Amino acid sequence: DGETLVAPSEMALTLSTGEVLGESPRVRSARRRAVTETIDAPLYRQSRFDAAYNELDLRLRGDYGILARAYDDGVCYRFYTERDGELTIVDETAQLNFEGDPSAYIPYSKTEIPMRTSFENTYEYAPLSKFRTQTVAFMPVLVDLGERGYVLYTESDVEAYPGVYLTYDKEAKGFAAVSYTHLRAH
């Protein structure tokens, strides 16, 4: 409906070489397309469903890019590279910022070592400004924007990657990803 639900938010990947994909990005090309496809889903309540989305492929200097998709009820993005060989990601910047102080359903890690969790927990409902800073949360997190709807913040396709935990960035007024590397260092 043309309404902004998420404030400007940063995203980047830091590689083991020290290079940061997403830092001062320079667009080489942008390609847009509208897609409608049928997806086979043998384990879903229906065996097939249609998905329609608008896609933006930003190719950036440095042989990498960001692929973003906007569906009727959600958006997603992913980094990709056009480089040969393997890359090692040592850190991730993934913010999700909001105007004002909306409330959210947040599952906090309640273990002494935050990354040792079964990802099962009760969700606490509170304004983002009341985010418990002495611990981290895990995904998904559901942000309540009142009559404007909800924003669900989650990750997908996590294989051979430790996943992301969340903390609250008071200055940016939103969630900031905390990687396994940061948690392990403390």
For each feature predicted by the language model, list its residue ranges.
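Broad, structure-driven detector of short, well-ordered beta-strand segments within folded domains
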Residues: D1, G65-R69, L152-Y153
